[in-house]
């Protein structure tokens, strides 16, 4: 089993963990509705980049 030869100092331990922080989500404003949304996702009104993606059909 692998065992460290020497104790890792607090400084080295913390430097190793420096990239483990939780980063905030990237939130953008929708061009058509003005609401907040995640980038590269369909907006609430079913639009993407200003174009309608899904159009609801009326039930007969």
Swiss-Prot record:
SUPFAM superfamilies: Zn-binding ribosomal proteins (SSF57829). It comes from Wolbachia pipientis subsp. Culex pipiens (strain wPip). One of its GO terms (cellular component) is large ribosomal subunit. InterPro entries: Ribosomal_bL32 (IPR002677), Ribosomal_bL32_bact (IPR044957), Ribosomal_zn-bd (IPR011332). This is Large ribosomal subunit protein bL32. Belongs to the bacterial ribosomal protein bL32 family. Coiled coil: none annotated. PANTHER family: 50S RIBOSOMAL PROTEIN L32, LARGE RIBOSOMAL SUBUNIT PROTEIN BL32. The gene is rpmF. Keywords: Ribonucleoprotein, Ribosomal protein. One of its GO terms (biological process) is translation. GO terms for molecular function: structural constituent of ribosome. Residues 1-23 are annotated as: Disordered.
């Amino acid at each position: 089993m692998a065992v460290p030869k020497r104790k890792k100092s607090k400084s080295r331990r913390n430097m190793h963990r420096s990239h483990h922080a939780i980063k905030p989500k990237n939130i953008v404003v929708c061009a058509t509705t003005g609401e907040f949304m995640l980038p590269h996702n369909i907006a609430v009104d079913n639009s993407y980049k200003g174009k309608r993606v899904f159009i609801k059909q009326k039930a007969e």
